[in-house]
Amino acid sequence: MHPNAANSLLKVIEEPQSEVYIFFLTSDEEKMLPTIRSRTQIFHFKKQEEKLILLLEQMGLVKKKATLLAKFSQSRAEAEKLANQASFWTLVDESERLLTWLVAKKKESYLQVAKLANLADDKEKQDQVLRILEVLCGQDLLQVRVRVILQDLLEARKMWQANVSFQNAMEYLVLKEI
């Protein structure tokens, strides 16, 4: 958001003209400016994962894939779109392999990053890989090793969002883990 737009928005929030209610809807509250977040009341709406899992199973996905996709997706439309997308499931398979190797501290993890970087050739796919890894880590938080990987993964995501190349951010993650 441009600074002038943010300032105008803050003025509207702080000095409403009349009985006005303003709603901001976002899939990631961290992307909202801190000054705006500090002047709002935040409500979290939970996804209806169980219903989405049932829908995805009815579409023909096995339970494991349906569960992963329900946790990954931010909407029913996104889940339905990705359910039949072969490229998405390739990213899932390769991300699972990377995480398995990271947990086992295998040096081959470094080679897997190159494979993922080739598959994730645009920002959208790169974001998908990072989100897939976050979901996979979230499924096994009881392991201390997985929690450490998740922390480093979040750091790698911040680097990527700060315009470090995807491959460099992922290589950083691997170097921290092996």
Residue ranges and their predicted role:
Residues 1, 10-14, 120, 127:
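Short, surface-exposed loop and linker segments with low hydrophobicity and enrichment for Pro/Ser/Thr
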Residues 18-21, 26-132, 136-178:
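Charged, glycine-rich active-site and insertion segments that engage polyanionic ligands
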